[in-house]
Swiss-Prot record:
Protein encoded by which gene: RH29
Domain Helicase ATP-binding per the UniProt entry, residue ranges: 59-232
InterPro entries documented for this protein: DBP10_C (IPR012541), DDX54/DBP10_DEAD-box_helicase (IPR033517), DEAD/DEAH_box_helicase_dom (IPR011545), DEAD_box_RNA_helicase (IPR050079), Helicase_ATP-bd (IPR014001), Helicase_C-like (IPR001650), P-loop_NTPase (IPR027417), RNA_helicase_DEAD_Q_motif (IPR014014)
Family: Belongs to the DEAD box helicase family. DDX54/DBP10 subfamily.
Keyword RNA-binding assigned: yes
This protein's UniProt keywords: ATP-binding, Helicase, Hydrolase, Nucleotide-binding, RNA-binding
Primary enzyme class: hydrolase
Motif (DEAD box): 180-183
Feature: compositional bias, Gly residues: 770-799
Name this protein carries in UniProt: Putative DEAD-box ATP-dependent RNA helicase 29
Annotated stretches, region: Disordered: 675-845
Length: 845
């Protein structure tokens, strides 16, 4: 009975425990994933309570072992979505287990950010993580590999370099592979590196692809070796955070610096952190110098920057010691600023994907943020392409005349449109910009450094513009028909009614176009002065003709306006009006007007273009060149480089190898110097083949990277012979690094040879420095005649003279005579010893 009662109690306890687990599972927290205590405690320590939508969708799939391709907007928690399952799968360090997880990142900064996050989530585990990125010492990375890491976080270029240098390094044990920012990795920029890395991975691996911009067509990722992958795409409609406010500000190219100073000084609060994107590193240097003259201390970051300097600048910005960070696209795709308030696109991004990655830095984790984009007249087509990609309508801000007619009604309608998701673009306050522009121009002209930097940045931007993808033809056409914009709504609060009237008056002066030609004006003057001639008659004829033509033009204009309004009302979606390209008040040609008047049955009409065509085209890897261009055969990076040299190097180059008599394909950013060396992206020169740096480090440190990546204290010591035939692995012993006293055959032979050479040298030193004699006699004694000897044994060779057919040049003072040594031959040399005595010319030394 007791046993039965105990069994009953244990069953009830087990039942209660299972019920508690079910309740926790229904809560939607991390408890429902049944994570181990080490990982779960680290998550709680980090402060996470509920998974984000992308984590809730992907983590159960990853834990089940299937391949996953996931897309979610920037700042949605994608990094934790693949790190938490990785830590749960690996659990703990396995000696002699090799590398079990590999995370590839396109940039060094993103890899460092992932490493920091991995250490925080894996703080309660003993897993070993190594970072392999460019810019760091190769010897230090060899040392990291000898410690037997379980997880490697790397960039493709450096990992490929290490694989080529270290023969014993293998990735066959990798069972968990993550491609972070997969669209950049699988773009044409890293094709060669990834091809070599993927060939060394095991086929029995789990592959994960994560990015903020991924296409739905997984055929573009065939290189990754996906096996029945699960596609998870969140926020496809809202590619940017709904808490992010977008402001598009039109400006002339020469006024962009003035507009930036005004925005930073007057509009953005001094306690808010702002990220400023520019096109090239030359613009970074110019804007940085300009800000310093204005007593503004920014931080900078660009691709060619030294790694240590980059870390210092970014860390100062993260510590809020500086409130501005000026960056390029190349450098910024890994910088994670958790509390960023504003993003300024000083140069409008040429691709919608780049815009999403830029503005995604702000408004993270439930915070609000603002994104300001400067739009020049040349950038208007790119802005329209962007809104096609975002599926958002766009309209100009109301003009000053419209605001003055009914300010309250116009402002209310504009605010309602912005709240409903419509993008409103407008101008800066021109009067304020003009004042700042004049002062900025004086500063640049008075400073030789600023003037030089401005000219350099202008040339760099000209080259940058040549490499930009072109917008779609439809957007170019629509941009020409867009009506004039007014002052942007964000500046309404600082503009008074009197200033609005002045701005309206100035705008009317700018838009004034006289109706009369110069000939008519002269005719009017002649008519007023009562000058006789045909001029007055011409004026009357032109007035009658213009009156008739104006009536016809106004009638046709009203008809076109009615047709355009009816067409816009028939459209179901607000963005389709931009696809058709009709703008209210625009003139339409006959063919286009006829096409607009055709009836389209909403019930039976099937469009040849998908509804999400523009969105998928912008996400596609093949669409990296933009909406308006075809795919190029040349390998072009997703991001345009930030300097002129980098722009030229973004195409794959081939170098003729004279020794191998074949072409060698160089990686992007590499070039061959006159000495046959490759100059890598970091600026370091390296030979085209294996450099041997690993072997030199191996000889110096007496360590090695074993094929199974064992522990450093057990397998990396290379003491003497290392056991029988090098197969028996011994533990750490005292003085294991000391060189063995047992010499092998080569060492004994080398030592004997050195000893024999030493004896020979000493003998020759004693007998007159050796001999160059022989068949022709030397200068002194020795077996073959030497150059000369000592005073007593100068000719001390065979028979105390020269044993050659020709006597030596000089002998000693006692044995050979002063004027020549004795010759044992019947023929005495002319310069050596004679037949019986001294030579004719030989003179003893």
């Amino acid at each position: 009975m007791v046993e039965g009662k105990g069994f009953l109690v244990s069953s009830v306890t087990e039942l209660h425990r299972k019920e508690k687990q079910k309740k926790k599972g229904k809560s939607g927290g991390f408890e429902s994933l049944n994570l181990g205590p080490n990982v779960f405690n680290a998550i709680k320590k980090k402060g996470y309570k509920v998974p984000t939508p992308i984590q809730r969708k992907t983590m159960p799939l990853i834990l089940s072992g299937v391949d996953v391709v996931a897309m979610a907007r920037t700042g949605s928690g994608k990094t934790a979505a693949f790190l938490i399952p990785m830590l749960e799968k690996l659990k703990q360090h396995v000696p002699q287990g090799g590398v079990r997880a590999l995370i590839l990142s396109p940039t060094r900064d993103l890899a460092e950010q992932t490493l920091k996050f991995t250490k925080e989530l894996g703080k309660f585990t003993d897993l070993r993580v190594s970072l392999l990125v460019g810019g760091d010492s190769m010897e230090d990375q060899f040392e990291e590999l000898t410690k037997g890491p379980d997880v490697i976080i790397a960039t493709p270029g450096r990992l490929m370099h290490l694989l080529s240098e270290v023969d014993d390094m293998t990735l066959r044990t990798v069972e968990y592979v993550v491609f972070d920012e997969a669209d950049s990795l699988f773009g044409m920029g890293f094709a060669e590196q990834l091809h070599q890395i993927l060939t060394q991975l095991s086929e029995n691996r789990q592959t994960l692809l994560f990015s903020a911009t991924l296409p739905s067509a997984l055929a573009e990722f065939a290189k990754a070796g996906l096996r029945e992958p699960q596609l998870v795409r969140l926020d496809v409609e809202n590619k940017i955070s709904p808490d992010l406010k977008l402001s598009f500000l039109t400006v002339r190219p020469e006024e962009k610096y003035s507009a930036l100073l005004y925005l930073v000084r007057e509009h953005i609060s001094s306690d808010q952190q702002t990220l400023i994107f520019v096109s090239t590193k030359h613009h970074v240097e110019f804007v940085n110098s300009l800000f310093k003259l204005e007593n503004i201390e920014p931080s900078v970051c660009y691709g060619d920057m030294d790694q240590d300097a980059r870390k210092i600048h970014v860390s100062r910005f993260r510590a809020r010691k500086t409130m501005l960070l000026i960056v390029t696209d190349i450098a910024a795709r890994g910088i994670d600023i958790p509390l960023l308030d504003n993003v300024i696109n000083w140069d409008f991004p040429p691709r919608p994907k780049i815009f999403v990655h830029r503005v995604g830095r702000a408004a993270r984790a439930g915070r609000t943020g603002c994104a300001y984009s400067f739009v020049t007249p040349e950038d208007m087509p790119y802005m329209l392409d962007l809104h096609l990609f975002l599926s958002k309508p766009v309209r100009p801000a109301p003009t000053e005349d419209e605001v003055l007619k009914n300010m309250e009604e116009v402002m209310t309608k504009t605010s309602q449109a912005i709240d409903s998701g419509v993008t409103v673009y407008g101008r800066f306050p021109q009067k304020t910009i003009d004042l700042i522009f004049n002062r900025t121009r004086e500063m640049i002209d008075s400073s030789a450094e600023l003037d030089s930097l401005e000219r350099t940045s202008t040339k760099a931007f000209r080259l940058y513009s040549k490499t930009k993808p072109s917008p779609s033809k439809e957007s170019i056409r629509r941009a020409k028909d867009l009506p004039r914009e007014g002052l942007h709504p964000i500046f309404r609060s600082i503009i008074e009614t009197g200033e609005l009237e002045a701005m309206s008056f100035f705008q009317k002066i700018k838009n004034f176009r006289p109706k009369q030609t110069i000939l008519e004006a002269e005719g009017e003057v002649a008519k007023s002065k009562h000058v006789k001639g045909p001029a007055g008659q011409w004026v009357d004829v032109m007035k009658k003709k213009r009156a008739i033509h104006e009536e016809i033009i106004n009638t046709r204009h009203q008809q076109n306006q009615k047709t355009s309004n009816n067409h816009l009302e028939m459209e179901a979606e607000p963005t389709t009006s931009f696809v058709d390209g009709t703008v209210e008040g625009s003139k339409v040609s006959g063919k286009k007007r006829k096409a607009q008047e055709t009836f389209k049955d909403d019930e039976f009409f099937i469009s040849s273009i998908p509804v999400n065509h523009h969105s998928e085209a912008g996400l596609s890897l093949r669409g990296n060149e933009g909406f308006g261009s075809n795919r190029l055969d040349a390998a072009v990076l997703d991001l345009v480089a930030d300097d002129g040299q980098g722009i030229k190097q973004q195409q794959s180059n081939y170098h003729w190898d004279k020794k191998g008599k074949k072409y060698i394909k160089l990686n992007n950013g590499d070039r061959v110097t006159a000495s046959g060396k490759i100059k890598t992206e970091s600026g370091a020169k390296a030979t085209a083949k294996k450099t041997g740096i690993y072997k030199r480090w191996q000889e110096r440190s007496h360590k090695k990277v074993s094929r199974d990546s064992g522990d450093a204290d057990e397998t990396t010591r290379m003491s003497g012979r290392g056991g029988r035939d090098g197969k028996r692995r011994q533990g750490s012993v005292p003085n294991a690094h000391v060189r063995s006293e047992i010499k092998d055959l080569d060492q004994v032979r080398k030592e004997r040879q050195q000893k024999a050479n030493k004896v020979s040298y000493l003998q020759s030193k004693r007998g007159g420095r050796g001999g160059r004699g022989g068949a022709r006699g030397g200068r002194g004694g020795g077996a073959r005649g030497g150059r000369g000897g000592s005073r007593d044994f100068g000719g001390g060779g065979r028979d105390f003279g020269s044993s050659s057919d020709r006597g030596g040049r000089s002998g000693g003072r006692d044995f050979g005579g002063r004027r020549g040594g004795a010759s044992t031959s019947s023929r005495g040399g002319k310069r050596g010893g004679g037949r019986g005595g001294g030579g004719k010319r030989g003179r003893g030394r």
